[in-house]
Amino acid sequence: MATANPGRGGGRRGGGAMDDDKLVFETTDGIEPITSFNDMGIKEDVLRGVYEYGFEKPSAIQQRAVMPILQGRDVIAQAQSGTGKTSMIALSVCQVVDTSSREVQALILSPTRELATQTEKTIQAIGLHANIQAHACIGGNSVGEDIRKLEHGVHVVSGTPGRVCDMIKRRSLRTRAIKLLILDESDEMLSRGFKDQIYDVYRYLPPDLQVCLVSATLPHEILEMTSKFMTEPVKILVKRDELTLEGIKQFFVAVEKEEWKFDTLCDLYDTLTITQAVIFCNTKRKVDYLSEKMRSHNFTVSSMHGDMPQKERDAIMNEFRSGDSRVLITTDVWARGIDVQQVSLVINYDLPNNRELYIHRIGRSGRFGRKGVAINFVKSDDIKILRDIEQYYSTQIDEMPMNVADLI
């Protein structure tokens, strides 16, 4: 169990799992995969929620991570995007919660509002018959509503670090009964600006806390940091050279100038029949620029970035999930963990600034083993970044063939 705490002294409906034979795990000795939900000792009402949610068989990461979490161990769980990480979190949380108490017993921190909200919804779905109450504490929503919900009593809080910390300091979120902390997408949370906020939250948590880190990528420096707040963690790791998702075909298109990217995008539209696509840009300004330009050329697109009010972001996400909108232009606020089943194509209009974001972006195009295509627009000064991504993931990104339409 954790913790030396310096302040005191992280799936889907539709059933299938990825082809586990293709995944290579570096896992703590003694961790045996459990291939059936029925063999996990899960409460019947939670199990009913799991099956109703659409799972038939645990995915690779669920087979290995759920039992150590339920046994109270600290866990570092690494799984590719789309392997059922969110559902693994929800299942574990629903099993450990004692519904006879109205106090918060599990806290999940996520880097984006959308991921925190999706986690909350998954917990509510899987925990429906167990009457598990979850609430998303996220910036952009009403503070008053957060206070009201928390004071009424919930079992699980899924939130972003800033708002969660605020609720703790206001004493609306009482931490004395929290026994499980989960850091979802912990690479993003710890390696960027969230580290201080996480430690702020930590200071208020009980000393016998159980800690889990869940992420698609776990760079060496992140694993080093875990020694500060985890005790003998069970490690469930995918080797890095297996991290590019199975079934994702990756290509690049060489564009000499920035201005040529738009024409290239229009040519792609003419060539392809797009079910649903996500187009990633590196800046909010570029998202706005590209969205306006696409609309002026009579393309129907949605767009989203972090400056938009939360209600607007929610409406856009719902529109895209339901299929009413087929093309979403966005920044990396969307790249982590958002589950949309029909996405068949991801276009990196800009290559990501951070190579570790690459897998989060292209992971959208083949969730749970679905096939997908990722196309990267590459200027001459981007070649080095592209090669760096290839080397980092031990993968090959070829020039886009003429028959790309046959691959989507």
Swiss-Prot record:
In this chain, where does the modification Phosphoserine occur?
100-101
Q: Identify the residues that bind ATP.
A: 79-86
What up-regulates or down-regulates this gene? Answer: Induced by cold and heat stresses.
Ranges where the record places region Disordered: 1-20
Listed GO MF terms: ATP binding; ATP hydrolysis activity; mRNA binding; RNA helicase activity
Q: Where is the signal peptide?
A: none
- What are its E.C. numbers? 3.6.4.13
Name the UniProt record assigns to this protein: Eukaryotic initiation factor 4A-III homolog
To which species is this protein native?
Answer: Arabidopsis thaliana (Mouse-ear cress)
Q: Encoded by which gene?
A: EIF4A3
